[in-house]
């Protein structure tokens, strides 16, 4: 999967993840087409900073990335909160907090806490929690990780006009694409197909290139 972090004219990083670890292209070496293996702390420098509310948007890989960051940050003693403004899969009940007492108990056990409201149509999923409870939990946290987009489990997505669903409190956005989309046709791997065709000026049989994926990110 690939990530585009802190996009700006002055500072950006493109991160790739495989089973063996994280790899980074940065502004200083991207022209040489070199990558370097980095730790999760180096790949996502905001983890070494103060409190952040981070929204994850885009396509395949958001949940696994959130889990990796939550696991590492919890191991560093941080009170990590995972939630959603769209939908996420329901965690084990012992990690789901419905009130402040449960939240503190989960953190005291060294795990990250998850909050959300049960989705009526699918009991295995959570939707965005009640906003007052969400903001209370965020206030108590050291790091907040929000899944703020959906892609029907496809590796590629071009957002609709109403997407992603970002809270005003969120100060960092991480865009995600699954590298498994590379070399595959738009119709096979891209959510919001018509949006993707328009963005790339391509038909549904077009095979995604590195340049296409950069354009989408």
Q: What kind of region is each of these model predictions?
A:
Residues 71-124:
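N-terminal phosphate/diphosphate-binding loop that engages ATP/GTP or pyrophosphate donors
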């Amino acid at each position: 999967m690939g990530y585009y972090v802190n996009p700006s004219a002055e500072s950006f990083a493109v991160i790739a993840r495989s089973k063996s670890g994280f790899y980074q292209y940065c502004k200083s070496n991207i022209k040489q087409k070199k990558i370097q293996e980095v730790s999760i702390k180096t790949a996502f420098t905001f983890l070494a900073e103060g409190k952040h509310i981070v929204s994850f948007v885009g396509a395949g890989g958001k949940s696994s990335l959130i889990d990796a960051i939550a696991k590492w940050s919890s191991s560093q003693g941080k009170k990590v909160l995972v939630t959603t403004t769209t939908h996420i899969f329901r965690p084990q009940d012992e990690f789901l907090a419905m009130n402040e007492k449960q939240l503190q108990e989960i953190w005291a056990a060294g795990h990250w806490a998850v909050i959300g409201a049960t989705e009526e149509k699918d009991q295995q999923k959570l939707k965005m929690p009640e906003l007052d409870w969400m903001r209370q939990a965020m206030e108590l946290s050291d790091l907040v990780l929000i899944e703020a987009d959906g892609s029907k489990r496809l590796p590629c997505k071009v957002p609709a006009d109403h997407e992603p669903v970002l809270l005003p409190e969120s100060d960092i956005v991480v865009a995600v694409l699954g590298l498994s989309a590379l070399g595959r046709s738009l119709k096979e791997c891209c959510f919001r197909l018509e949006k993707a065709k328009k963005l790339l000026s391509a038909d549904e049989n077009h095979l995604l290139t590195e340049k296409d994926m950069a354009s989408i990110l």
